[in-house]
């Protein structure tokens, strides 16, 4: 996104008018000999009046009148260039704006107190143009004058990354993340991505945690897909846990057509026929797997009422099996009730699955705070607790509290 140039100094403190002559109020009194002549001052005053009305075309026409005056002083050229940079920027003539900033910075008439704003504007214009050498040039000068904000640090990181100085890019990315957190803001996504890329080989777990921060900010299917794909390789992954991960992929809209085919086949194998139909159809998958899922789904739904009654009286595993079916058919309140029974009774073949299903059923009913607590309470191996952690992130996002960090996954046991 193009950042706005610093307008306050350009308009509020650049020029004041006395008897039709533009006088500059930027120098100390002892240096006030620099003035703008009436011939230059009148069109510049007209430009400033047009700027106040956001009439940029008129402002540019007035600046050109000032530029047409013969025998201008270096100070007059400095003032013209300073105003020109603002007007050209708002006319989206970024090349002219940058040229004007460069000329103002190079002027021997530039007041020292103007340097910070001019460097800031040069940095932003180079950032808008993706001119990495210019970003680095202005960024280093600006950093020597004042602390850089998270976005500026992130832009420097991007510039160094794209000029193949990965080590320096990582340093600025880390600074950007730290500065954002210190200010209570979300870190710039680019800084997180550069950090994650640097961590990928040396510290995969740290890279995954950084990717979680990105997902918390974007909630984009593409970022969810990256995070979920990495998680499939977690130690202890089983078919049941993988299915819970596919369910997450489905609700986050990260499930691709080829993955829908695999997920649907797995759902059929686990006898999650409702899930199989939903997932296969979502991916546009047709053929034997969908036909089988539809046939078995029709049979199962015809006997569900009896199965629910039996599950209420039966074991924890029986309650869990029926709850899984209810979840697949979108009957989330009933799935929640039986999942609670399964948690209470215990005896599941898959430790942690009853608690996991409880959390998923709560999420699908928009009970996000309860769901997060349910996911935190999931026990089991590393894969089970990791998948529960990701579902907890989803609940956190849907509950509107994604600005804070994700809760750490519980240790597997």
Regions found by a protein language model. Name each.
Residues 36-45, 74-81, 111-121, 145-155, ...:
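Generic helix N-cap/helix-start motif at coil->alpha-helix transitions
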Residues 50, 88, 126, 160, ...:
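Residue at a conserved register position within TPR or TPR-like alpha-solenoid repeats
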Residues 63-65, 95-105, 132-143, 167-179, ...:
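Alpha-helical repeat scaffolds
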Residues 319-413:
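C-terminal soluble interaction/assembly domains
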Residues 2-6, 10, 14, 21-102, ...:
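N-terminal leader/linker segments that initiate helical-solenoid repeat arrays
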Residues 53, 91, 129, 163, ...:
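Structural motif corresponding to the intra-repeat A-B loop/turn of tetratricopeptide repeats
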Residues 289-325, 337:
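Flexible internal linker/loop segments at domain or repeat junctions
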Residues 42-58, 317-334:
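Alpha-helical segment of the N-proximal tetratricopeptide repeat
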């Amino acid at each position: 996104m193009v950042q706005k140039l610093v307008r306050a100094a350009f308009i509020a403190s650049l020029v004041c008018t006395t008897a039709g002559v533009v006088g500059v109020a930027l120098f100390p009194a002892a240096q006030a000999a620099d003035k703008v002549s009436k011939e230059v001052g009148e069109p510049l005053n007209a430009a400033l009046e047009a700027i106040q009305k956001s009439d940029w075309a008129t402002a540019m026409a007035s600046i050109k009148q000032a530029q047409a005056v013969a025998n201008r002083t270096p100070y007059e050229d400095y003032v013209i260039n300073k105003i020109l940079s603002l007007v050209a920027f708002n006319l989206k003539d970024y090349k002219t704006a940058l040229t004007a900033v460069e000329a103002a910075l190079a002027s021997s008439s530039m007041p020292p107190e103007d340097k910070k704003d001019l460097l800031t504007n040069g940095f932003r214009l180079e950032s808008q143009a993706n001119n990495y050498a210019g970003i680095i040039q202005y960024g280093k000068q600006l950093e020597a004058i004042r602390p850089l904000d998270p976005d500026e640090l992130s832009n420097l990181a991007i510039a160094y990354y794209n000029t193949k100085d990965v080590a320096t890019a990582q340093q600025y990315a880390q600074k950007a993340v730290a500065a954002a957190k210190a200010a209570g803001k979300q870190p710039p996504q680019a800084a997180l991505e550069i950090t994650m890329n640097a961590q990928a080989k040396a510290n995969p777990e740290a890279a995954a945690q950084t990717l979680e921060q990105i997902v918390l900010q974007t909630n984009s299917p593409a970022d969810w897909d990256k995070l979920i794909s990495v998680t499939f390789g977690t130690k202890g992954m089983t078919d049941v846990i993988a299915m819970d991960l596919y369910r997450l992929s489905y609700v986050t809209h990260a499930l691709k057509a080829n993955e829908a085919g695999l997920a649907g086949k797995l759902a059929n194998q686990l006898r999650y026929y409702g899930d199989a139909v939903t997932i296969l159809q979502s991916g546009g998958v047709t053929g034997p797997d969908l036909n089988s899922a539809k046939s078995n789904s029709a049979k199962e739904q015809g006997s569900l009422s009896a199965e629910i009654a039996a599950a209420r009286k039966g074991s924890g595993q029986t309650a869990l099996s029926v709850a899984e079916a209810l979840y697949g058919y979108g009957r989330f309140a009933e799935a929640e009730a039986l999942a609670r029974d399964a948690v209470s009774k215990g005896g599941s073949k898959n430790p942690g699955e009853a608690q996991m299903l409880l959390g998923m059923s709560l999420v699908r009913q928009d009970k996000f705070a309860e769901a997060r607590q349910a996911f935190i309470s999931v026990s089991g191996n590393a894969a089970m607790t990791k998948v529960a952690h990701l579902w907890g992130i989803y609940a956190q996002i849907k509950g509107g509290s994604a600005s804070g960090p994700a809760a750490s996954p519980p240790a597997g046991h």
